[in-house]
Design a protein with these regions (language model features):
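Hydrophobic packing residues within well-ordered alpha-helices of enzyme cores
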Residues: 65-69, 95, 121-122
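Glycine-rich phosphate-binding loop signature in dinucleotide/nucleotide-binding domains
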Residues: 47-49, 102-107
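Active-site-proximal alpha-helix that buttresses catalytic centers in soluble enzyme cores
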Residues: 2-86, 127-131, 142, 176
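Domain-level recognition of soluble alpha/beta enzyme cores
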Residues: 126-165
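Short, solvent-exposed aromatic-acidic interface loops
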Residues: 164-175
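Residue-level preference for the first positions of well-ordered beta-strands
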Residues: 7, 108-110, 147
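A glycine-rich beta-strand to alpha-helix segment
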Residues: 106-128
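Terminal, non-globular segments
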Residues: 36, 93-97
């Protein structure tokens, strides 16, 4: 199918608790979070998940999550990486608008972002019809270092609710 696209959503790995001296934006990954991000990276590499375009929130924890994927060897060739301030705590609608702006030549895209928006976007894309175990897990929660993979059979500009087929739900805790 000519318009088939792959979308990967990844919530950043576990970050340090908010401290008085550190803004939410600047919270780094914990040691456990860095290990979880590396595990997700290895799982992505093993599954052949290497998106062409990576849209990443500029927060420290999302940037460190991306760096862990890169260090795990996810990409043989460097992807087009776009740090987007609009992804910091973005709503599902804001993320859909960003995806709608992707050119059709982009076969595979990834967003590395934050809850609650990322979880809500994943739930909206997958819809509520299917009761496959992956859908049930998606409906329940979207913990840190969780990845979902979707196939989308429409042009990027038409991405919307119930527009995707959930292919994979993978939480780092599944890999420990």
């Amino acid at each position: 199918m000519a318009n088939m696209h792959q979308l990967i959503l990844l919530r950043h790995a576990k970050a340090a608790a908010t401290a008085a001296a550190v803004s939410d934006h600047d919270r780094p990954l914990t040691d456990a979070g860095a290990a979880a991000a590396a595990n997700i990276g290895r799982a992505m590499r093993a599954a052949g998940l290497a998106p062409d375009v990576v849209l990443v929130s500029p927060s420290v924890r999302t940037q460190q999550t991306f760096a862990a994927l890169e260090a795990a060897g996810v990409w043989a060739e460097w992807p087009n990486v776009e740090p987007l301030p609009a992804l910091y705590m973005a709503s599902p609608q804001q993320m859909r608008d960003i995806l709608r702006g992707l050119p059709e030549t982009v076969r595979s895209a990834m967003i590395i972002g934050h809850n609650p928006g990322l979880h809500e976007l994943a739930r909206k894309l997958a819809g509520t019809a299917a009761q496959h175990p992956q859908h049930v897990r998606l409906a329940e929660s979207y913990p840190t270092a969780t990845l979902t993979e979707f196939l989308i059979a429409t042009p990027w500009r038409k991405i919307g609710v119930n527009a995707a087929s959930l292919q994979r739900f993978l939480a780092a805790k599944d890999l420990a």
